[in-house]
């Protein structure tokens, strides 16, 4: 059984900083379809994608908070 993650906190941060998913996808060099697959648990985020997304230039997520954005199980 695959673990399903709750990306609601990540989605909120994306909208707060970029206004919509399309602008965010463009900023990280990912298609909207690829981003949608990841946010809907169809494909996992790659470690290097997580590092880039959390960087100060993108979402500025501190290392200590990465777990709550990417690894919170959906209940």
Residue map of PLM features:
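Residue-level detection of the helix-turn-helix DNA-binding "recognition helix"
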Residues: 12, 40-42, 51
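Recognition helix of helix-turn-helix/homeodomain-like DNA-binding domains
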Residues: 30-45
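DNA major-groove recognition helix of helix-turn-helix/homeodomain DNA-binding modules
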Residues: 48-66
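Helix-turn-helix DNA-binding elements, focusing on the entry/boundary residues of the two helices
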Residues: 21, 32, 50
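Residues in the recognition helix of alpha-helical DNA-binding motifs
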Residues: 27, 38, 69
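A short, Lys/Arg-rich alpha-helix, primarily the initiator
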Residues: 1-22, 27
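Short amphipathic recognition helices of helix-turn-helix/homeodomain-type DNA-binding modules
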Residues: 65-75
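Residue at a beta-strand N-cap/secondary-structure junction
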Residues: 18, 44-47
């Amino acid at each position: 059984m695959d673990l399903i993650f709750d990306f609601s906190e990540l989605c909120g941060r994306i909208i707060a900083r970029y206004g919509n998913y399309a602008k965010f996808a463009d900023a990280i060099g990912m298609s909207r379809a690829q981003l949608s697959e990841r946010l809907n648990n169809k494909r996992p985020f790659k470690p290097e994608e997580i590092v880039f997304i959390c960087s100060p230039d993108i979402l500025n997520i501190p290392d200590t908070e990465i777990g709550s954005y990417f690894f919170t199980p959906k209940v």
